[in-house]
Amino acid sequence: DRICTGITSSNSPHVVKTATQGEVNVTGVIPLTTTPTKSHFANLKGTKTRGKLCPKCLNCTDLDVALGRPKCTGTIPSAKASILHEVKPVTSGCFPIMHDRTKXRQLPNLLRGYEHIRLSTHNVINAEKAPGGPYKIGTSGSCPNVTNGNGFFATMAWAVPKNDNNKTATNSLTVEVPYICTEGEDQITVWGFHSDNETQMVKLYGDSKPQKFTSSANGVTTHYVSQIGGFPNQAEDGGLPQSGRIVVDYMVQKSGKTGTITYQRGILLPQKVWCASGRSKVIKGSLPLIGEADCLHEKYGGLNKSKPYYTGEHAKAIGNCPIWVKTPLKLANGTKYRPPAKLLKER
C-alpha cells in the first residue's frame, strides 16, 4: 500500500519577503503597489482646485492679475488646492519690469498659497497728497485701460511731481501704509519705483541722480537704489517702446500692523492691496485641469488611488495619495507553500 499527503503538487509562483524568514513561497498574494503612468492634472476630489489665479481674465498672466494690470482685474476663486503652473512667472505685459532686482516673480506664487484672495475696494493711501507732492498720477500708453486709454497697474500709483515747484531733488520722504483689510487677513501691499535715462529723470522728477527706496513691514526691511539709464527701448505686448524700467516689490502686513515706505523721486506708491487668508496646498503642475482625481502628483499628474502604495518617481503629492515605496509590496493571502510530498513505502 502507498500513502500520500493531501498537498498540492504544483509549484508556487508567489514569493514574498518576510522580516524573519527572508524569501518565502506562498500559495497566494495580493499586490499592494502600483506604478503610475503620467497623466493630465485634474481637480482634486472633494475640494476646489485653482489653476489660473483669475480664470475669467482672458489673455492675462498670473503676474498681470497679481499686479492689477488694466483689463486683468477680476475675482480670484477660493481654493483648498492650487496648481503652480508658472514655475517662473512670465513678465507682465504692461510696462517693462526689472525682475532680477526684486522678488516680484514670487508674488503670484505667494497669492496662490492662500485659500481666499481679494483685492481691496479702495486705495490704501491718497497718492496725490503723499509726502513730496502734490503729485499727478502717471499713466502709460503701454498699459491701456478698459476704454483703451492710458492706464497703469491697480496696485500702484506712479507719483510724478505735479508742477515745477516740487519737480526737484528731495531728501528721503516717508509714508505710512495702514492696514485696511477688514477680516484679519494678511495684507499684501505692492509698491515699486520707476527709473529712466538722465534726460527723462530730469524731465519727470527734476533729478537725474540714483534714488533711494526702503520698505519695512512685519520685521522685514528692504533697501533699493535705482539704476539710471542703460536700458534699451522695450515694448510689452505690442505697446509703445519704453526707455525706462520699473522695479516692483511687495510687503506682507499682518492684521492691524502699519508698514512704511521711505522714498525719493520715481516712487510707485501702493494703492489697492491684496487681502488674503487661509491656506491652499500648492503643487507644481500644468493646465488645463481635466476631470477629477484622488491625488495630484508633481510627476504623474492626476492619480486615482487603486492601491495603498506606489513605486516609480518620488515627488510631492497632495490629496488622498498612495504612499511611495522603493520596491513593490505584496500581502500574502494564502498559506506557506510546501513542496509535494514524496511517496512513502510501507515498512
From Swiss-Prot:
Binds to sialic acid-containing receptors on the cell surface, bringing about the attachment of the virus particle to the cell. Plays a major role in the determination of host range restriction and virulence. Class I viral fusion protein. Responsible for penetration of the virus into the cell cytoplasm by mediating the fusion of the membrane of the endocytosed virus particle with the endosomal membrane. Low pH in endosomes induce an irreversible conformational change in HA2, releasing the fusion hydrophobic peptide. Several trimers are required to form a competent fusion pore. It comes from the Viruses. InterPro entries: Capsid_hemagglutn, Hemagglutn_HA1_a/b_dom_sf, Hemagglutn_influenz_A/B. In natural infection, inactive HA is matured into HA1 and HA2 outside the cell by one or more trypsin-like, arginine-specific endoprotease secreted by the bronchial epithelial cells. One identified protease that may be involved in this process is secreted in lungs by club cells. Palmitoylated. Gene3D superfamilies: 3.90.209.20, Hemagglutinin Chain A, Domain 2. Homotrimer of disulfide-linked HA1-HA2. Glycans are attached at N25, N59, N145, N166, N304, N333. GO terms for biological process: fusion of virus membrane with host endosome membrane; fusion of virus membrane with host plasma membrane; symbiont entry into host cell; virion attachment to host cell. This is Hemagglutinin. It comes from Influenza B virus (strain B/Finland/148/1990). Belongs to the influenza viruses hemagglutinin family. Keywords: Disulfide bond, Fusion of virus membrane with host endosomal membrane, Fusion of virus membrane with host membrane, Glycoprotein, Hemagglutinin, Host cell membrane, Host membrane, Host-virus interaction, Lipoprotein, Membrane, Palmitate, Transmembrane, Viral attachment to host cell, Viral envelope protein, Viral penetration into host cytoplasm, Virion, Virus entry into host cell.
